Amino acid sequence: MFRVKICGVTTPDDARLAAEAGADAIGLNFVPGSVRCLNMEAARSVAAAVPAGVLKVGVFAGADQAEIRRIATAVGLDAIQLHGHLEGVAGLVDPPATCAALADMQLIRAVRLEADGLAAARRWLAAAEAAGARPALVIVDASTPRNAPGSALGGTGAKVDWAALAREAPLGIPIVLAGGLDPDNVAEAIRITGVIGVDTASGVESAPGRKDPHKVRAFITAAHHALDTQTA
Protein backbone atom coordinates (compact mmCIF):
# COMPACT_ATOMS: atom_id res chain seq x y z
CA MET A 1 0.00 0.00 0.00
CA PHE A 2 2.84 2.38 0.88
CA ARG A 3 6.51 2.41 1.84
CA VAL A 4 6.97 5.87 3.33
CA LYS A 5 4.20 7.75 5.13
CA ILE A 6 4.42 11.23 6.63
CA CYS A 7 1.76 11.37 9.30
CA GLY A 8 0.14 14.18 11.24
CA VAL A 9 0.14 16.58 8.29
CA THR A 10 -1.83 19.70 9.23
CA THR A 11 -1.35 22.17 6.37
CA PRO A 12 -1.62 22.09 2.57
CA ASP A 13 1.98 23.30 2.29
CA ASP A 14 3.23 20.38 4.37
CA ALA A 15 1.15 17.96 2.29
CA ARG A 16 2.73 19.29 -0.90
CA LEU A 17 6.18 19.19 0.70
CA ALA A 18 5.84 15.53 1.66
CA ALA A 19 4.46 14.50 -1.72
CA GLU A 20 7.12 16.38 -3.68
CA ALA A 21 9.82 14.82 -1.49
CA GLY A 22 8.62 11.33 -2.43
CA ALA A 23 6.19 10.22 0.29
CA ASP A 24 3.83 7.45 -0.80
CA ALA A 25 1.21 8.40 1.78
CA ILE A 26 0.07 11.36 3.88
CA GLY A 27 -1.57 10.85 7.28
CA LEU A 28 -4.48 13.07 8.34
CA ASN A 29 -5.19 12.84 12.06
CA PHE A 30 -8.76 12.67 13.40
CA VAL A 31 -7.90 11.46 16.92
CA PRO A 32 -9.51 13.59 19.66
CA GLY A 33 -6.94 15.20 21.92
CA SER A 34 -4.06 14.98 19.47
CA VAL A 35 -2.21 18.22 18.70
CA ARG A 36 -2.39 17.17 15.05
CA CYS A 37 -6.16 16.52 15.01
CA LEU A 38 -7.88 18.21 12.06
CA ASN A 39 -11.34 19.70 11.80
CA MET A 40 -13.25 19.08 8.60
CA GLU A 41 -12.33 22.36 6.93
CA ALA A 42 -8.63 21.86 7.56
CA ALA A 43 -8.79 18.21 6.52
CA ARG A 44 -10.39 19.07 3.20
CA SER A 45 -7.73 21.71 2.54
CA VAL A 46 -4.91 19.29 3.30
CA ALA A 47 -6.47 16.52 1.22
CA ALA A 48 -6.96 18.85 -1.74
CA ALA A 49 -3.21 19.55 -1.78
CA VAL A 50 -2.27 15.86 -2.03
CA PRO A 51 -1.52 14.92 -5.65
CA ALA A 52 -2.89 11.86 -7.39
CA GLY A 53 -0.87 8.75 -6.64
CA VAL A 54 -0.18 9.68 -3.01
CA LEU A 55 -2.47 7.95 -0.52
CA LYS A 56 -4.55 10.03 1.87
CA VAL A 57 -4.76 8.00 5.08
CA GLY A 58 -7.21 8.97 7.81
CA VAL A 59 -6.01 8.14 11.34
CA PHE A 60 -8.79 7.34 13.83
CA ALA A 61 -9.05 6.04 17.39
CA GLY A 62 -12.29 5.08 19.09
CA ALA A 63 -14.54 6.42 16.32
CA ASP A 64 -17.56 4.39 15.26
CA GLN A 65 -17.75 3.11 11.71
CA ALA A 66 -20.48 5.55 10.70
CA GLU A 67 -18.32 8.52 11.72
CA ILE A 68 -15.30 7.08 9.94
CA ARG A 69 -17.30 6.59 6.74
CA ARG A 70 -18.72 10.11 6.95
CA ILE A 71 -15.29 11.68 7.28
CA ALA A 72 -13.74 9.42 4.64
CA THR A 73 -16.38 10.45 2.11
CA ALA A 74 -16.27 14.15 2.96
CA VAL A 75 -12.48 14.38 2.86
CA GLY A 76 -11.80 11.87 0.10
CA LEU A 77 -9.67 9.45 2.09
CA ASP A 78 -8.05 6.49 0.34
CA ALA A 79 -7.40 4.37 3.42
CA ILE A 80 -8.36 4.14 7.09
CA GLN A 81 -5.86 3.63 9.91
CA LEU A 82 -7.29 2.35 13.19
CA HIS A 83 -4.85 3.65 15.80
CA GLY A 84 -6.79 3.11 19.03
CA HIS A 85 -6.10 0.62 21.79
CA LEU A 86 -6.41 -3.06 20.94
CA GLU A 87 -8.22 -3.95 24.15
CA GLY A 88 -10.19 -2.24 26.89
CA VAL A 89 -13.74 -1.41 27.83
CA ALA A 90 -13.59 2.37 27.61
CA GLY A 91 -11.66 5.13 25.96
CA LEU A 92 -10.11 5.16 22.52
CA VAL A 93 -10.47 1.46 21.69
CA ASP A 94 -10.82 0.05 18.18
CA PRO A 95 -12.31 -3.46 18.56
CA PRO A 96 -12.16 -6.10 15.82
CA ALA A 97 -15.84 -5.40 15.12
CA THR A 98 -14.89 -1.95 13.78
CA CYS A 99 -12.49 -3.55 11.33
CA ALA A 100 -15.19 -5.99 10.24
CA ALA A 101 -17.70 -3.17 9.74
CA LEU A 102 -15.21 -1.39 7.46
CA ALA A 103 -14.07 -4.48 5.57
CA ASP A 104 -14.96 -2.91 2.21
CA MET A 105 -12.38 -0.15 2.78
CA GLN A 106 -8.57 -0.12 2.64
CA LEU A 107 -7.65 -0.74 6.28
CA ILE A 108 -4.46 -0.32 8.26
CA ARG A 109 -4.19 -1.45 11.89
CA ALA A 110 -1.72 0.20 14.25
CA VAL A 111 -0.53 -2.11 17.02
CA ARG A 112 2.01 -1.73 19.80
CA LEU A 113 5.01 -3.81 20.73
CA GLU A 114 4.50 -4.61 24.40
CA ALA A 115 6.53 -6.50 27.01
CA ASP A 116 4.99 -9.72 25.67
CA GLY A 117 5.73 -8.76 22.10
CA LEU A 118 2.85 -8.72 19.64
CA ALA A 119 0.62 -11.10 21.60
CA ALA A 120 -2.26 -8.61 21.89
CA ALA A 121 -1.92 -7.74 18.22
CA ARG A 122 -2.15 -11.40 17.26
CA ARG A 123 -5.32 -11.84 19.32
CA TRP A 124 -6.90 -8.77 17.74
CA LEU A 125 -5.99 -9.81 14.20
CA ALA A 126 -7.30 -13.34 14.77
CA ALA A 127 -10.62 -11.96 16.05
CA ALA A 128 -10.88 -9.56 13.11
CA GLU A 129 -10.18 -12.34 10.63
CA ALA A 130 -12.78 -14.55 12.30
CA ALA A 131 -15.26 -11.71 11.76
CA GLY A 132 -14.37 -11.56 8.07
CA ALA A 133 -11.89 -8.67 8.04
CA ARG A 134 -8.17 -8.44 7.47
CA PRO A 135 -6.13 -5.21 7.41
CA ALA A 136 -3.91 -4.67 4.40
CA LEU A 137 -1.07 -3.40 6.59
CA VAL A 138 -0.04 -3.43 10.23
CA ILE A 139 1.85 -0.46 11.69
CA VAL A 140 3.94 -1.34 14.74
CA ASP A 141 4.27 1.63 17.09
CA ALA A 142 5.75 2.13 20.54
CA SER A 143 3.90 0.90 23.61
CA THR A 144 1.47 3.25 25.39
CA PRO A 145 -0.29 2.90 28.75
CA ARG A 146 -3.65 1.12 28.68
CA ASN A 147 -6.44 3.65 28.00
CA ALA A 148 -3.96 6.44 27.25
CA PRO A 149 -5.56 9.60 25.81
CA GLY A 150 -5.39 10.61 22.17
CA SER A 151 -2.40 12.85 22.83
CA ALA A 152 -0.34 9.78 23.81
CA LEU A 153 -1.41 7.34 21.10
CA GLY A 154 1.19 8.40 18.54
CA GLY A 155 3.56 11.12 17.46
CA THR A 156 5.27 11.12 20.85
CA GLY A 157 8.76 10.23 19.65
CA ALA A 158 8.83 7.02 21.72
CA LYS A 159 10.78 4.25 19.97
CA VAL A 160 9.97 0.62 19.28
CA ASP A 161 12.54 -1.97 20.39
CA TRP A 162 13.76 -2.84 16.90
CA ALA A 163 15.65 -5.97 17.95
CA ALA A 164 12.60 -7.30 19.79
CA LEU A 165 10.43 -6.69 16.74
CA ALA A 166 12.95 -8.50 14.54
CA ARG A 167 12.62 -11.57 16.78
CA GLU A 168 8.84 -11.71 16.39
CA ALA A 169 7.32 -14.42 14.20
CA PRO A 170 5.61 -13.05 11.07
CA LEU A 171 2.06 -11.75 11.47
CA GLY A 172 1.06 -12.85 7.99
CA ILE A 173 0.41 -9.20 7.14
CA PRO A 174 3.04 -6.70 5.89
CA ILE A 175 4.51 -4.58 8.69
CA VAL A 176 5.31 -0.87 8.62
CA LEU A 177 7.40 0.55 11.46
CA ALA A 178 6.56 3.74 13.36
CA GLY A 179 7.65 5.18 16.68
CA GLY A 180 10.55 7.58 17.14
CA LEU A 181 11.82 7.41 13.56
CA ASP A 182 13.80 10.33 12.18
CA PRO A 183 16.27 11.01 9.35
CA ASP A 184 19.21 9.82 11.45
CA ASN A 185 17.86 6.42 12.53
CA VAL A 186 15.38 5.30 9.87
CA ALA A 187 17.92 3.41 7.74
CA GLU A 188 19.19 1.44 10.75
CA ALA A 189 15.61 0.71 11.84
CA ILE A 190 14.79 -0.73 8.43
CA ARG A 191 17.99 -2.80 8.37
CA ILE A 192 17.37 -4.33 11.79
CA THR A 193 13.63 -4.99 11.50
CA GLY A 194 13.25 -5.84 7.82
CA VAL A 195 9.93 -3.99 7.62
CA ILE A 196 8.39 -3.11 4.25
CA GLY A 197 7.76 0.54 5.12
CA VAL A 198 8.07 3.33 7.68
CA ASP A 199 5.84 6.02 9.16
CA THR A 200 6.81 9.18 11.03
CA ALA A 201 5.18 12.30 12.45
CA SER A 202 7.20 14.01 15.18
CA GLY A 203 10.51 12.83 13.73
CA VAL A 204 10.26 15.32 10.86
CA GLU A 205 8.78 18.29 12.71
CA SER A 206 10.07 21.69 13.76
CA ALA A 207 7.13 22.00 16.21
CA PRO A 208 4.13 19.76 16.93
CA GLY A 209 2.08 19.58 13.75
CA ARG A 210 4.53 21.58 11.61
CA LYS A 211 6.89 19.72 9.30
CA ASP A 212 10.50 20.73 8.81
CA PRO A 213 11.33 20.71 5.07
CA HIS A 214 14.93 19.56 5.55
CA LYS A 215 13.92 16.72 7.89
CA VAL A 216 11.08 15.59 5.63
CA ARG A 217 13.32 15.40 2.57
CA ALA A 218 16.17 13.74 4.47
CA PHE A 219 13.86 11.16 6.05
CA ILE A 220 12.18 10.19 2.80
CA THR A 221 15.48 9.95 0.92
CA ALA A 222 17.07 7.79 3.64
CA ALA A 223 14.00 5.57 3.93
CA HIS A 224 13.66 4.92 0.21
CA HIS A 225 17.39 4.19 -0.10
CA ALA A 226 17.30 1.70 2.80
CA LEU A 227 14.15 0.00 1.51
CA ASP A 228 15.59 -0.24 -2.01
CA THR A 229 18.82 -1.72 -0.64
CA GLN A 230 16.87 -4.25 1.40
CA THR A 231 14.95 -5.55 -1.63
CA ALA A 232 17.84 -5.41 -4.11
Task: Identify the function of each model-found stretch.
Residues 1-5:
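Extreme N-terminal starter segment of soluble prokaryotic enzymes
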Residues 15, 43, 68-69, 125, ...:
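Generic hydrophobic/aromatic pocket-lining and core-packing "Φ" positions
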Residues 18, 80, 138, 161, ...:
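Conserved, mostly hydrophobic/aromatic
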Residues 20-22, 74-75, 133, 192-193:
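Structural motif
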Residues 23-35, 81-89, 142-148, 193-216:
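Glycine-rich phosphate-binding active-site loops on the catalytic face of alpha/beta enzymes
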Residues 30-34, 47-177:
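Conserved anion-binding
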Residues 41-42, 46-50, 93-102, 201-232:
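C-terminal helical cap(s) of enzyme catalytic domains, especially alpha/beta-barrels
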Residues 166-194, 205:
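A C-terminal functional module that forms or caps the active site or interfaces directly
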